[in-house]
Amino acid sequence: MNVYGKIDEKQEESHYQDWSVPEKREGAPIPFFSILLWSLVATAISIALPFIFGLVSPQQTQDLYTGWALHQNGQMYTDYFGTEGLLYYVLAYLFRGSILIALVEWLALFGAGVFLFKAADTLVGQEKEAKRLVFILYLLVAGLAFGGGYALLLALPFLFYSLSIVTNYLAFPKDDKGFVRVGMSLALAFFFAPIPTALFAAVLALGIIGFNLGKGHFVHGLYQFFASALGFSLLFYPLGYYTVWTGSFGDAISQTLYPVNTLSLFSNSHLLENAAFYCLLAIGLGSLGLLFAGLFQSKPAKQYALSIAASLGVLLSLGILILSKEPINGTRLVVIIPFLVLLLLTGIKEDVSEGGSRRRRRREKQTSFLKEISIYH
């Protein structure tokens, strides 16, 4: 009887560990070739073709002209107006606003695909679905970034790198290393596309807070906050000091916040026009169904925490576009790409076949062991 009792206790203990403490598995191999090919096609459609046929958006044309003009004279933010981050204008300066910037965009999209695949594979363990998600990312880029939104495309690899670290923690809560790198990657993304990065960082923070509250990981939450803040500061202050040194710090802050400071509800003559255009375009992309699934669909805690925050990110991004006084342009909807991708990621069903088969094998071994004991007794 003692023998049977010990075996039963071990069986119950192992069953509990399978459900409560996920075992970290080896990730699926990254499909580098397909990501390289898809990112090249997305770059050609969104950047090369608009350059060739003169279809670059007015805002993007102004940014590229600024890169050329900086070679002639003047300082960024002081002599030239710009709402994007400092590193974006540095690249525009280096390439003189030419089509050569497409090479950097290609590298950025390739990196974004790699890190998004890792994040999806870690969170849900579905290699095929992770590949589909990366493909959908490039479809969104090719469609929404046709002739504009290049600053956000450059920020995507840093945004998705931080996402890959966060999803690793959500999937394996005991492994919460790397949050200093989360802050550093978000700082780099901020110096390309400030406002979308701030929204994405808020979404990740809300997702982690919700997950930690549900699991009671308060100490983890404090560590993650301070580690991320440290990582952000390590890059933000050295890079931001350039604007202090050139005397353009105040102008940089005011111009970066210009899209937010000029939002208006009652004195906006373009309000109805913006609402109809951006909402219909977002609905056509499937945002309504994704929002409903993100808010109300039942899913594991690690996915539900992110889906709620991502839904808020989509709504806030659309709200900024609707309340904006800027002229209507479809490329401005590129800001919702990271949040749509997050909603798609959290809507993937987790692969439990591996864990189930592992538990079945363990039960089969224990059953055969019991049979052997019964024979000898």
Q: What are these language model-derived features?
A:
Residues V166-L188, F218-L222, F226, I308-L312:
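Short hydrophobic alpha-helices at membrane interfaces in multi-pass membrane enzymes
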Residues G178-P194, F200-A205, L316-I322:
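Membrane-interface alpha helices of multi-pass inner-membrane proteins
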Residues F160-R181, L290-A301, I348:
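Membrane-interface transmembrane helices that cradle and orient dolichyl/undecaprenyl
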Residues A102-G125, Y161, I165, F292:
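Transmembrane-helix motifs of polytopic, lipid-linked glycan transferases
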Residues G113-G143:
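Transmembrane-helix signature of polytopic, membrane-embedded enzymes
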Residues I322-S357:
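Hydrophobic/aromatic-rich transmembrane helices and adjacent perimembrane loops
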Residues A145-A155:
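Short acidic/glycine- and proline-prone juxtamembrane loop motifs at membrane-interface regions
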Residues L199-S233:
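Perimembrane helix-loop-helix junctions
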